[in-house]
């Protein structure tokens, strides 16, 4: 149903890939959603969870790379790392989010593919919805400023921490690409 409906859409499409995504199924979906193999048409959104990112993302990238299918790759380190705190609040741990982001970039560097984007849920407000970060929001702080009506968001400080991490990872990625170009020349 959903795949059939999306085949006729002219807009770019994002396809979520979790730890249970099978390589063969993914290739079939890519071919259905992007039958003309157009660049920019389809972005695969990896949401594996911090403990699965290396093990589960590599086979997917490898299969797509071998197939010659054109996709963009994006990391969503939020959804695969949602947990329930002992207080009952739904939360996410900064360390887990950052580990998944690092893993996403590491796998792409290893596979010589492009880490094309990241997706974060965040707010500029000083909320206490995700634990960790330099101000050490912990489970006992969650009730202080837990304002979300849906999923836990990074607060302003946590968002900046993540922005600096991504900047470092992008710089490292760019430097690796430069080294490869020099090695080939």
Residue ranges and their predicted role:
Residues 1-4:
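Short, small-residue-biased leader/transition segments that mark boundaries at the very start
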Residues 6-14, 21, 162:
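Conserved internal helical-beta-strand scaffold that buttresses enzyme catalytic cores
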Residues 8-14, 36-43:
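Short, surface-exposed connector motifs at secondary-structure boundaries
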Residues 15, 76:
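Conserved, mostly hydrophobic/aromatic
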Residues 20-30, 52-56:
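Active-site-adjacent beta->alpha loops and helix N-cap segments on the catalytic face
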Residues 29-35, 59-63:
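Short, solvent-exposed amphipathic alpha-helical segments in soluble enzyme
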Residues 41-73, 79-128:
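Non-transmembrane, aqueous-exposed alpha-helical and coiled segments at domain scale
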Residues 109-185:
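Flexible, D/E/H-enriched segments
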């Amino acid at each position: 149903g959903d795949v059939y409906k999306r085949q006729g859409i002219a807009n770019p499409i994002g396809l979520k890939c979790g730890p249970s995504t099978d390589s063969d199924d993914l290739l079939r979906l890519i071919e259905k959603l992007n039958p003309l193999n157009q660049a920019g048409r389809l972005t695969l959104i990896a949401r594996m969870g911090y403990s699965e990112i290396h093990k589960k993302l590599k086979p997917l990238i490898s299969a797509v790379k071998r197939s010659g299918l054109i996709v963009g790759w994006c990391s969503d380190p939020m959804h695969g790392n949602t947990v329930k705190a002992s207080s009952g609040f739904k939360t996410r741990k900064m360390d887990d989010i950052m580990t998944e982001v690092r893993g996403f970039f590491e796998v792409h560097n290893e596979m010589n593919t492009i880490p094309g984007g990241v997706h974060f849920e965040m707010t500029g407000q000083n909320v206490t919805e995700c634990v960790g970060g330099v101000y050490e929001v912990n489970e006992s702080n969650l009730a202080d400023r837990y304002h979300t009506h849906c999923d836990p968001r990074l607060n302003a400080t946590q968002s900046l921490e993540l922005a600096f991490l991504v900047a470092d990872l992008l710089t490292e990625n760019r430097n690796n690409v430069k080294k490869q170009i020099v090695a080939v020349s």
